[in-house]
Amino acid sequence: VSAQKKTQKTYIPWSNGKLVVSEEGRYLKHENGTPFFWLGETGWLLPERLNRDEAEYYLEQCKRRGYNVIQVQTLNNVPSMNIYGQYSMTDGYNFKNINQKGVYGYWDHMDYIIRTAAKKGLYIGMVCIWGSPVSHGEMNVDQAKAYGKFLAERYKDEPNIIWFIGGDIRGDVKTAEWEALATSIKAIDKNHLMTFHPRGRTTSATWFNNAPWLDFNMFQSGHRRYGQRFGDGDYPIEENTEEDNWRFVERSMAMKPMKPVIDGEPIYDEIPHGLHDENELLWKDYDVRRYAYWSVFAGSFGHTYGHNSCLLYTSDA
């Protein structure tokens, strides 16, 4: 056993080349033709809530369990503060002096997470900034351009980045800001794929399928059970189809041009039906598997998992 461990090597997927979209637009592959099946893990607040040792441990567990993409929020707030008390912005959206000598800053910690993941063969799905602060006016178009330039210049040469524009938000909310962020990154970074993480029960294909910066579509099937409408007046799907995540695959792949599609946020394991009401029943592992089967068999190029104990890294989880 010890000899086997010594010879066992970490699989580095980008040794097959960068991720690209297949010619027919159905799935992702590497430059040498090796197919890539996305098996994502949701670790939204990893950059903020875990220290170096905890982050390394978490990423190692992800590797051992076969995940290959870890989805994180680069910024959850403006500014965000991490476990070391360091802020993501020390001078607004001016990042000129963000690196302070002798200080292990917010972005140093982000660098550490990305490079630790790379050593383990893991991609980081980077939600550049969550949707709520943008919807509240905390990033305008010029600021989005500055932030996108900063991100692209800092991470364009890292091998394991996948860019997420948006963050639990509709694409018709603050569209100009999202477009500015996406295009400013793509103008500098030619090495990494990009998508848009939308609001529950919507798909990025609705707004951005023709956008040249969007390499593949993402939908959020959401966390509601059949008939759990909550009285929403502006409901984006037919009632009593809430659990049918395969419908989003069909809807997305019917668009022209066809782009690969994935459920980037389905129901979370051990989360209440509808997400927030603790008196509700909890989604279980067999529910999670059903979502994965339905999505992948309908034609998605992978799937993302999430568990209540890992999403926000709360001490009492």
Question: What function would you assign to each model-found segment?
Answer:
Residues V1-T7:
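Bacterial Sec-dependent N-terminal signal peptides
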Residues Y11-Q228, Y235-D244:
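Active-site mouth of glycoside hydrolases
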Residues L39-L50, T90, S295, G299-H303, ...:
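Short, charged N-terminal helix-start/capping segments
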Residues A211, F216, Q220-R224, F230-C310:
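Catalytic-core region of carbohydrate-active enzymes that cleave or remodel glycosidic bonds
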Residues Y313-A317:
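Conserved small/polar residues in nucleotide/adenosyl-binding loops
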